[in-house]
Amino acid sequence: MKEAREAMPNVGSSSSQYVLAAIKFIQFNYSHDISVDDIAQAVGVSRSHLYRVFMSNVGQSPIDYLTSYRISEACSLLKNSGLSIAEIAVSVGFFDQFYFSRVFKKVKGVPPSKYLVALEKEAQAAPQPINP
């Protein structure tokens, strides 16, 4: 949320308050099947108004932000949770593992399975602490 505030120059304006409320809604509900209409309704503005103020303040559409946030959370889970890719997909709001993999690849450049392999290789290459 702090990053969102820093990215928006007019945090005091009402449009920025709508965006902050939308971001908060996304962060609390990203794991559910939510749409831009749901976000707009939660914030109390029309879908088109939300789109305009989001683009103006964040530089991306609400759906792109939601997708980016979901993929970011998926990356954290891939790195830290030990959950399967299917479990991670569901936990970040994708109810079709194959669609999740396509979206993940579009955003990150590699499918989640290859991302996980890269994380494992990175962990193996990291220096191990010396036990006394």
Language-model segments: residues:
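Proline-centered helix-kink/hinge sites
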Residues: 62, 111-112
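An amphipathic alpha-helical interaction segment
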Residues: 1-10, 14, 18-24, 49-51
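Terminal helix-turn-helix DNA-binding modules in bacterial transcription factors
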Residues: 20-24, 28, 33, 37, ...
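A short alpha-helical element within helix-turn-helix/winged-helix DNA-binding domains
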Residues: 39-41
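Key DNA-contact positions within bacterial/archaeal DNA-binding proteins
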Residues: 48, 98
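Metal-dependent phosphohydrolase cores
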Residues: 100, 108
